[in-house]
């Protein structure tokens, strides 16, 4: 009888040990899991960062996956040229070539009749003629005064390549494609022995109420703000400057009680577009009090200080910031490595090892 009880005890002890081991494994896994929230106003580059994670930390895009973006890219091209020609009357701009009046009409007719995501030869020809027109180019130069995709000139300048019969989108084409994020998109990948769960949340105002249940147990927030948006207005509200909206949103996040213990990293994104724009448009259009040099460095540092000065807990909470170009894989790789090191350092600090 005694030996029976002993065997039972041994079995219980064995099970208990297995359970302890399992709990320890789960705890170790949990400790190595980083929950990363990508936040920011609409069109600040969050989804492009997610695509870069696939390129850098997963296996990138297979030819089959690249092909799936073809229809999206064609849709972006059509939306872009339509946005430009529809803005011309509002801005009081005429076509330089009289023949383009007919081309504009033809474009509108074709846009209504073609299958979405396709690019028939007659449409390509009309877009090519319109894009060459001086009036269309003048309207494109004033893109901040209406809503236009950042990738418009990238695609329209390469119309022949992307409309060739054997066209297969490359990684840069995929990175520059634009689809509005609705809901929450999760991406999983591993870096430096850490398991990342990255959540990309729609940035438009209507999407933001979906963020709240993502807040639980967040390790790090990457907040994306578009540097180049300083002279632009929101898609949802043409009375609100995009940079002001971004600052307002950052203020509510960096000082939120939910994020008292969360690392916050600021990505001042679209530095390439900002570098071009700042040569032509003074920063005082957004910040009337700014009287510094209208150089990339000075204006960029001023914007950075506007964000960082919003942090009410500077004495205990450091906010890390980086100038980024989300379409530049090497830049994103370098910056994300730095972010990973910050997360490791903060984790060690929490454990009292730093």
Swiss-Prot record:
CDD domains: G-alpha (cd00066). Its main location: other. A lipid is attached at residue 2 (N-myristoyl glycine). Residues 265-272 are annotated as: G4 motif. It comes from the Eukaryota. SUPFAM superfamilies: P-loop containing nucleoside triphosphate hydrolases (SSF52540), Transducin (alpha subunit), insertion domain (SSF47895). Residues 173-181 are annotated as: G2 motif. Mg(2+) binds at residues 47, 181. GO terms for biological process: adenylate cyclase-modulating G protein-coupled receptor signaling pathway; background adaptation; cell morphogenesis; cone retinal bipolar cell differentiation; detection of chemical stimulus involved in sensory perception of bitter taste; detection of light stimulus involved in visual perception; dopamine metabolic process; gene expression. Residues 196-205 are annotated as: G3 motif. One of its GO terms (molecular function) is G-protein beta/gamma-subunit complex binding. Residues 32-354 form the G-alpha domain. GTP binds at residues 40-47, 175-181, 200-204, 269-272, 326. InterPro entries: Gprotein_alpha_I, Gprotein_alpha_su, GproteinA_insert, P-loop_NTPase. Residues 35-48 are annotated as: G1 motif. Residues 1-27 are annotated as: Disordered. Keywords: Cell projection, GTP-binding, Lipoprotein, Magnesium, Metal-binding, Myristate, Nucleotide-binding, Sensory transduction, Transducer, Vision. Belongs to the G-alpha family. G(i/o/t/z) subfamily. Guanine nucleotide-binding proteins (G proteins) are involved as modulators or transducers in various transmembrane signaling systems. Transducin is an amplifier and one of the transducers of a visual impulse that performs the coupling between rhodopsin and cGMP-phosphodiesterase. This is Guanine nucleotide-binding protein G(t) subunit alpha-2. It comes from Bos taurus (Bovine). The gene is GNAT2.
């Amino acid at each position: 009888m005694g030996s029976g009880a002993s065997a039972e005890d041994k079995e219980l002890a064995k099970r208990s040990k297995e359970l302890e081991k399992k709990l320890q494994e789960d705890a170790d896994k949990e400790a190595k899991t980083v929950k990363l929230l990508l936040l920011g106003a609409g069109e600040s580059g969050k989804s492009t960062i997610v695509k870069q994670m696939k390129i850098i930390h997963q296996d990138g895009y297979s030819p089959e996956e690249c092909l799936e973006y073809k229809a999206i890219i064609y849709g972006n091209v059509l939306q872009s040229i339509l946005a430009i020609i529809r803005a011309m009357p509002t801005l009081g701009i005429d076509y330089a070539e009289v023949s383009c009046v007919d081309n504009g009409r033809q474009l509108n007719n074709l846009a209504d009749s073609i299958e979405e995501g396709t690019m028939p030869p007659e449409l390509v020809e009309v877009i090519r003629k319109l894009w060459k027109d001086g009036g269309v180019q003048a309207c494109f130069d004033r893109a901040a005064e209406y809503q236009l995709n950042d990738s418009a000139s990238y695609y329209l300048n390469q119309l022949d390549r992307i409309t060739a019969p054997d066209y297969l989108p490359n990684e840069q084409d995929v990175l520059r494609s634009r689809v509005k994020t609705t809901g929450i998109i999760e991406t999983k990948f591993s870096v430096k022995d850490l398991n990342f769960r990255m959540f990309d949340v729609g940035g438009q105002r209507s999407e933001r109420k979906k963020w709240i249940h993502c807040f639980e147990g967040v390790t790090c927030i990457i907040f994306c703000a578009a540097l180049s948006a300083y002279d632009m207005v929101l898609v949802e509200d043409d009375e609100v400057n995009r940079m002001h909206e971004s600052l307002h949103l950052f203020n509510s996040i960096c000082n939120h009680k939910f994020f008292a213990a969360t690392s916050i990293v600021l990505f001042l994104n679209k530095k390439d577009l900002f570098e071009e724009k700042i040569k032509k448009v003074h920063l005082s259009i957004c910040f009337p009090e700014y009287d510094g040099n209208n150089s990339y460095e000075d204006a960029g540092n001023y914007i950075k200080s506007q964000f960082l000065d919003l942090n009410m807990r500077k004495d205990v909470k450091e906010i890390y910031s980086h100038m980024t170009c989300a379409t530049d894989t090497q830049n994103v790789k370098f910056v994300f490595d730095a972010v990973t090191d910050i997360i490791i350092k903060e984790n060690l600090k929490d454990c009292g090892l730093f």
